[in-house]
Amino acid sequence: MSGIHDFTLASARDALKARKISAVELTNAHIDAIERLDGQLNSFITRTPDQAREAAKASDEALAKGEGGSLCGIPLGIKDLFCTNGVRTTAASKILGNFVPPYESTVTANLLKDGAVFLGKLNLDEFAMGSANLTSAFGPVENPWKRKDSDAKLVPGGSSGGSAAAVAAGLVLGATGTDTGGSIRQPAAFTGIAGIKPTYGRCSRFGTIAFASSLDQAGPMARNLQDCAILLESMAGFDPRDSTSVDTPVPHYEAALKRGVKGLRVGIPKEYHVEGMPAEIEALWQQGMTWLRDVGAEIVEVSLPHTKYGLPTYYIAALAEASSNLARYDGVRFGERVSASTLDGLYEASRAAGFGDEVKRRILIGTHVLSSGYYDAYYLRAQKVRTLIQQDFLKAFENVDVLLTPTAPSGAFAQDEKPTDPVQMYLNDVFTVPASMAGVPALSVPAGLDARGVPLGLQLIGKFFDEETLIAAGHAIEQAAAFHHRPTIHAGVSA
């Protein structure tokens, strides 16, 4: 079965429909890989092999009748921020403990309706707050990649680090992620895979545990953009249970791969040439411009003048929303519960014990910026600047079709290289946050390796609800980059 782990999601779909492989075979191979490798990677919080085998058996029965949806028999992993009916959902936090939702998130329900097989729930930064998957109550996730000159354990990025690591290592054919300020794109870049943050409102947030409600957006993570396109078409769609869901048709995203980019105007934001950017990141960015120019795109410099305010604005607006969203967790019904002599004391002690340090830091900051006397100075001002950031993008898109930037300011760093200053960690999102603040779609594609053999990604940012053009441009980069490298730890590599 060694060849099974060479499948992409698209090629596995085609093989299943042609009956060249059974869903049970495919699922068992991935379950075996998880059992073999995830003790080291720690990409899963909860595994569901028995349910997966039952679902695979049902998929084979459907396929034998010529039935089944677009994902029939495809083994996926689900970020443990999506509520899954009857399966533990933790948000990687002790405060949720062994919470088992009695309902299904819309995104996962859509995937199940199309026949997907869920292998389990994937690790993440606690409540999706982090850029390195180091804040999980269930331990850090290890990036399956290694540097050429070191055996140090690398971070997979965050917050969707478990999703990224599982896809990169071949433990799943695709995974769900969420992106609030870069949590799909940055880990995709760190692990050499593709990831799409759709337009805000494209995928329903119903049943997804909230971090920052005006920013959170679900999206796909997979080996390449074709696989991401297949997943996104299933995940997306209007949902009346989410007041921010937008009622607009979902295109056939996979068809966008054939569109080509001749005549496409690609904007290069001059403000993204940040001080101290490593030479190899700058060189990769220039290479990306060359690749697109070579297939007929036009490169145009643009200005996003409020870029420098992106991070501080994000860390005011997002943390304010987080402090409000996380106020509901009290330790009474589930999760970490600490006894106290009064009800208020129980709340305080349970929250102090149940939340990790990074989450508590963000709750404190968010509560402060919303407090009397500081609301106008911080939160209200941040919302006004956020509008200016969005206007920057709208103005740029009057002249160009997409924007091209690096995804992250570096490749993956070692787990023990974590900066002690949280602000330094927040800088990992410097290139991804502005698109989140504007609500526009963005994606990351693997484009090369750094000098130490670790993946680097390029980011494309698009117009509202124009994920198709992003996918077409991203596919052009994929074809030119020909990124076929495999990480050190991979299901297809013999132990």
UniProtKB/Swiss-Prot annotation:
It catalyses: L-glutamyl-tRNA(Gln) + L-glutamine + ATP + H2O = L-glutaminyl-tRNA(Gln) + L-glutamate + ADP + phosphate + H(+). Keywords: ATP-binding, Ligase, Nucleotide-binding, Protein biosynthesis. Its EC number is 6.3.5.7. GO terms for biological process: translation. One of its GO terms (cellular component) is glutamyl-tRNA(Gln) amidotransferase complex. It comes from the Bacteria. GO terms for molecular function: ATP binding; glutaminyl-tRNA synthase (glutamine-hydrolyzing) activity. It is an enzyme of class 6 (ligase). Pfam families: Amidase. The active site is at K79, S159, S183. The keyword ATP-binding applies. Heterotrimer of A, B and C subunits. Belongs to the amidase family. GatA subfamily. Allows the formation of correctly charged Gln-tRNA(Gln) through the transamidation of misacylated Glu-tRNA(Gln) in organisms which lack glutaminyl-tRNA synthetase. The reaction takes place in the presence of glutamine and ATP through an activated gamma-phospho-Glu-tRNA(Gln). NCBIfam families: gatA. This is Glutamyl-tRNA(Gln) amidotransferase subunit A.
